[in-house]
Amino acid sequence: TPFGEHLVCQVGLIVENIERTAQKYCDIFGVEMPPIQVTPTYDVTQTTYRGEPCDATARLAFFDFGQVQIELIEPDMQPSVWRDYLNEHGESVHHIAFIVKDTGAAVAYLAGHGIDVLQQGLYGDRSGMYTYLDSAPALGVMLELLENFPQPR
């Protein structure tokens, strides 16, 4: 399969208030507050949602716990995989993520299992791309694919 070593690298959580939730993680786990980042808009990320250009943004915070990263996501009000999920499910686990070397191959493989792309875009620094897939009906959770592009040396 295109999933390499099958290592889950990230668990994403949708939240209403990123500062409040991040502070709870800091208090409970005794870790430092990470910087809160805002995803860039379409002109940078080329994000599509359900196949259409998408201007939605989100505020993100990342906690590294060993080999697994916890991502907190506070969406803006624009339609997106993040906003729709928060509206439908409230604050909860949003996705599990895998690092892949070839997003196209992974997407084609999953399409063969009836799992289609929901949202896709470039990282804010354009060093890679993310892809959310409509896997919850089959797997009970949304999948995210993360591809880091080779960097010039």
List the predicted regions and their residue ranges.
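Conserved short beta-strand elements that form part of the metal-binding/catalytic scaffold
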Residues: E32-D84, S127-P150
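Catalytic phosphate/metal-binding cores of nucleic-acid and nucleotide-processing enzymes, i.e., regions
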Residues: E5
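Extended intrinsically disordered, low-complexity coil regions enriched in Ser, Thr, Gly, Ala
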Residues: N17-P40, R83-E91, V100-D125
